[in-house]
Amino acid sequence: MAKEPTRVRRRERKNIVSGVAHVNASFNNTMITITDAQGNTISWSSAGAMGFKGSRKSTPYAAQVAAEDAGRKAAEHGMRTLEVEVSGPGSGRESALRALQAAGFTVTSIRDVTSIPHNGCRPRKRRRV
């Protein structure tokens, strides 16, 4: 019995001019998601998805490569201007932002949306090296 050939789904080209780049820079990884104004994901990338493993994922260079990849995918959909929302304490915050600007996007605003607890959960124990 022959299997049906699996059909490859091609991504249709959306024509979106402006969007929001969400940069989530944690201590272990940096994730970049580019959405339209309503919050629908247009493109995404992360340091881990770009082939970095372990402690190399948390480097600024890995964040730069991930931002360039997400920006290239978003530019295929016609995106030109971005608002950037940065969250998290990681080292890839500034380098991801610079990579998006170097990719040819016009950055209209930069917002830090890192959540700060009003004495919520107990923090993890101190590292002793």
Swiss-Prot record:
Q: Name one GO molecular function term.
A: structural constituent of ribosome
Keyword Cell wall biogenesis/degradation carried by entry: no
Please provide the record's keywords in A-Z order: Ribonucleoprotein, Ribosomal protein, RNA-binding, rRNA-binding
Q: Which GO terms describe its biological process?
A: translation
Which Pfam family is an annotated match for this chain, by its short name? Ribosomal_S11
Q: Name one GO cellular component term.
A: ribosome
Under the heading SUPFAM superfamilies, the entry gives:
Translational machinery components
Matches recorded under NCBIfam families: PRK05309.1, uS11_bact
Please report which protein family the annotation says this sequence is part of.
Belongs to the universal ribosomal protein uS11 family.
Function (record text)? Located on the platform of the 30S subunit, it bridges several disparate RNA helices of the 16S rRNA. Forms part of the Shine-Dalgarno cleft in the 70S ribosome.
Describe its partners and assembly state.
Part of the 30S ribosomal subunit. Interacts with proteins S7 and S18. Binds to IF-3.
Q: What is this protein called?
A: Small ribosomal subunit protein uS11
Species in which this protein is naturally found: Methylorubrum populi (strain ATCC BAA-705 / NCIMB 13946 / BJ001) (Methylobacterium populi)
Q: From the UniProt record, report the name of the gene that encodes this protein.
A: rpsK
